[in-house]
Amino acid sequence: MEQHFNTPAEVIDNNMKAGEGKAHLPLGKMILLGIMAGAFIALGGATSSTAAHAIDNVGLARFVAGIIFPVGLMIIVFVGGELFTGNCLIVMDVVGKKVTWFECIRNLIVVYFSNLIGALIIDTLIYFSGNLDYTGGLLGAYAIKVAVGKVGISPLKGITSGILCNILVCIAILMAAAATDIVGKIWAIFFPIMAFVVGGFEHCVANMFYIPVGMMAAQNPEYVAKAQEAYGLTAEQIQGLTVLHSLNNFIPVTIGNILGGMVFVGIPCYFIYKKKWQKWHEESKNA
């Protein structure tokens, strides 16, 4: 019977070949692809926020946002881009000795800050486009509320939520690689990414949109007044939206995303599908 998808072993093989290429990209290309990916994820965040901001029921709001947000990763898969969270899977090449730790870390650092640049570009465009004026400024107030919630997260929650998030993101990437046609790839991306949004898990690159755009919105008195009225936020909470306080989110969430992608997905997949278990078993018996 004809097979219309790649097997898990084939997926890991293909992902490792792609990971080796990612680690050895020229610096300029790596930066440009990172900027693109950050911008695409930010566009997913912006449009999903617009769709969900006026919905009072939390579960329904997350469901609606979850339907829209996956477009960001879909664009990256089909158009191109280097996404920090997905590139955590390069760890498979490190374990397989195709890439050095230095090359892996270099890629992750360059891509991380390139993603940030791309997200900040979209943050700025969204703010000055008037998009946050929707519903009498409620979207701007919503941006503030989301950012306040994110900078107030505890380190433990940030790490554990980041782990859960990148398990799903990396699974989405591997599932998309398993599909052999466009429709299959779309659905393969859609459900895991929707799950992480509905679950409310923390994604460091998505937060490069949510936190800065909330900080920008906090400079607008109209949005601030609306946030205080609609969500009961205090002046102190809103004033806490600073670059320094944003690190309360970015540091633990980034650590969690790395652990989720590397320890919970990348390394186990390598050992399941690439390690020569029979040879290892024979060596163990002879030892």
Predicted feature residues:
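Alpha-helical transmembrane segments and their helix-helix packing motifs
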Residues: 1-287
